[in-house]
Amino acid sequence: MSGATLEAYLASCTTHGDELSRDVAAVIQRLAKAALDIRKLVNQGALGTVFNGMHSGSNTDGDVQKDLDILCDDQFLSCLQGAPVACYASEELENPVLLDPAARLAVAIDPLDGSSNIDNNISIGTIFSVLPAAKGPDVDPSQSFLQPGNRQLAAGFFVYGPQTALVLSLGRGTEIFIFSSRLGCFVDAYKSVGIPDRANEFAINMSNYRHWEEAIRLYVDDCLAGSEGPRERDFNMRWIASLVAEAYRILVRGGIFLYPADSRKGYSHGRIRLVYEANPIAFIVENAGGSATTSVDRILDLVPESLHQRVPLVFGSRREVARITRYHVDPNMIGERAPLFGKRGLFRA
């Protein structure tokens, strides 16, 4: 339904008599409305009263919260009041919030991903996951979020950039909607997005090279060696330091994103939050024909141990993601490389 409004698209995906799909559609429409309000705040830039303000507290990761982080979290929580949502979990909150115990859905969200980039006018966004709510007498709301990502009913992210976009998957493909100021709504601009299997771009923060494990170094060395190395073709490197912006680019034109675990304190288990960042991104990417792993294991098969658990994240073009896994698990991938591209690599550790 390319060119359809978000409302029309959701209506087309709602099966007659299927109350669960109607509930999912209702939640997505509420999130979209809240995102448009946040878009207005972000577009004010430094002119906005909450743009640069620092909150006195910190989030679950220990990061100092900006006032805009808190405002966005409040905005999304408020928009889901009265929606068919049993509980709400957020990066900004230590524990889930119970909304309607009788409702069927649970929503996990990163209200303002990339907020450290706000001052630099780089695209930021909101990432969300819609899950079936855990049921049972006296059930702990956190149980709704301790289920593998392959149980997600929907996932998406908003990008607040030159265009305001919604990337959405209901489990049957991935669509990209762009907000039309003329129509006042989101319009389907990229129908059934497909990530190419073959990639010529990779995104990673090269400043951490010395901290990576050998398999990641070797993969990057081979990409940098280009047509003169074992890959026998040239690669470009990208790094925006905004997960939603990186994911959007890969969905539109292919490539691979790597945020591996490394040897720094606090990074040995990765840095991307599984429940409300890695899982929704992986769901979106897989429904666009790509792959998402921890470098070895499929993201969507992981069972979260805690709400704010962190993991390494590699996603994008299927062949490249599979190659990185082979670098980790198949010693022959190292032995078969040309001597110049052996363990030493192009950079000294």
UniProtKB/Swiss-Prot annotation:
Binding note for cofactor: Binds 2 magnesium ions per subunit.
Catalyzed reactions per annotation: beta-D-fructose 1,6-bisphosphate + H2O = beta-D-fructose 6-phosphate + phosphate
Pathway: Carbohydrate biosynthesis; gluconeogenesis
EC number: 3.1.3.11
Keyword check for Lyase: no
Keyword Magnesium listed: yes
Keywords, comma-separated and alphabetical: Carbohydrate metabolism, Cytoplasm, Hydrolase, Magnesium, Metal-binding, Plasmid
Positions with a binding annotation for substrate: 113-116, 205
Sites where the protein binds Mg(2+) 1: 91, 110, 112
Main subcellular location of this protein, as a coarse class: cytoplasm
Required co-factors: Mg(2+)
BP term (GO), one: gluconeogenesis
Residues where Mg(2+) 2 binds: 110, 113, 277
GO molecular function (one): magnesium ion binding
Transmembrane segments: none
Pfam family, one: FBPase
This protein's GO CC annotations: cytosol
HAMAP family named in the record: FBPase_class1
PANTHER family hit by this protein: FRUCTOSE-1,6-BISPHOSPHATASE-RELATED, SEDOHEPTULOSE-1,7-BISPHOSPHATASE, CHLOROPLASTIC
Entry similarity comment: Belongs to the FBPase class 1 family.
Protein name: Fructose-1,6-bisphosphatase class 1
Annotated organism of origin: Sinorhizobium medicae (strain WSM419)
